[in-house]
From Swiss-Prot:
The chain crosses the membrane at residues 2-22, 44-64, 85-105, 113-133, 163-183, 188-208, 223-243, 255-275. The keyword Cell membrane applies. This is Undecaprenyl-diphosphatase. It comes from Streptococcus pyogenes serotype M4 (strain MGAS10750). It catalyses: di-trans,octa-cis-undecaprenyl diphosphate + H2O = di-trans,octa-cis-undecaprenyl phosphate + phosphate + H(+). Catalyzes the dephosphorylation of undecaprenyl diphosphate (UPP). Confers resistance to bacitracin. Its main location: membrane.
Length: 279
């Protein structure tokens, strides 16, 4: 029944809206949840759905940060306009590694890593990394506390860390936040740049998935269009809350709790995979 599919779409939209911005892997969570709750749709649609619903989350970022990201915003001084264009240039530079590496390798990673065990391992590995990095940085003051002071070189290397998220379970936001902190930025700068970098990255990735879906000869029926719209709208609404939460959270806390969450979840998934394989 369509109503059941739409309820599932709402649920998946909630998962996407929360996990897209927290460093816990949205795609990984969607794949995991769909192990137990699946849309009654073909595999090609589900694979496209898992990526394209990110558009709702991206529109939320654009709405929240519209004035900050808009170089044509009335009232901005010449210096503020210049800084806005410089920010966009940093974002473009940070996209280069993904264009050169992640895009060509996407199909291979999708074929070999989009199942439970690699996701669980990635969750654990990056969970340990978050805890270790936070302990190392506990007594250190960040070198970059303002996006305006972040160099183009740093932006490029943050983009290199983003490439790591091609492995499901890694988390795009987790990889870029972790990379930015390692490179000397404050948590606030790391989170903000992660949000901004997501706009072209996820728009591009969603667009590629949609184009590939249609070029492969697939099409969308009315129910599938509705499912995508409902899931994306839900992701948009939930993302508004999740982004506000994370921006407030990083002002007072570190990311250790997310590292612990990843380790616990990854361990449970490995146990589940073991028993599923044995029995």
């Amino acid at each position: 029944m369509l109503i059941i599919e739409l309820l599932k779409a709402i649920f998946f939209g909630i998962i996407e809206g929360i996990t897209e911005w927290l460093p816990v892997s949205s795609t990984g969570h969607l794949i995991l949840v769909q192990e137990f709750i699946r849309l009654n749709q073909d595999k090609a649609f589900i694979e496209m759905f898992n990526i394209v619903i990110q558009l709702g989350a991206i529109i939320a970022v654009m709405l929240i940060y519209f004035e900050r990201l808009n170089p044509f915003q009335p009232g901005k001084t010449a210096r503020e306009v210049q800084l806005t264009w410089q920010l966009w240039l940093k974002v473009v530079i940070a996209c280069i590694p993904s264009i050169l590496i992640a895009v060509p390798l996407d199909n291979w990673f999708e074929a070999h890593f989009y199942f439970m065990v690699p996701i669980a391992i990635a969750l654990i590995v990056y969970g340990i990394a978050f805890i270790w990095i936070e302990k190392q940085n506990a007594q250190q003051e960040p070198a970059v506390t303002d996006l305006a002071r972040m160099s183009y070189k740093t932006a490029f290397f943050i983009g290199c860390f983003q490439v790591l998220s091609i492995v499901p379970g890694t988390s795009r936001s987790g990889a870029t936040i972790l990379g930015a902190i390692i490179l000397g930025t404050s948590r606030t700068v790391a989170a903000d740049f992660t949000f901004f970098l997501a706009i072209p990255t996820m728009f591009g990735y969603s667009g590629l998935k949609a184009v590939k879906f249609f070029l492969d000869g697939h099409h969308l029926d009315f129910a599938q269009v509705l499912i995508l719209l409902v899931a994306s709208l839900t992701a948009f609404v939930v993302s508004l809350l999740a982004i506000r939460f994370l921006t407030d959270y990083v002002k007072k806390h570190d990311f250790t709790i997310f590292g612990k969450y990843r380790i616990v979840l990854g361990s449970l998934l490995l146990i589940y995979s073991f028993f599923k394989f044995v029995f």
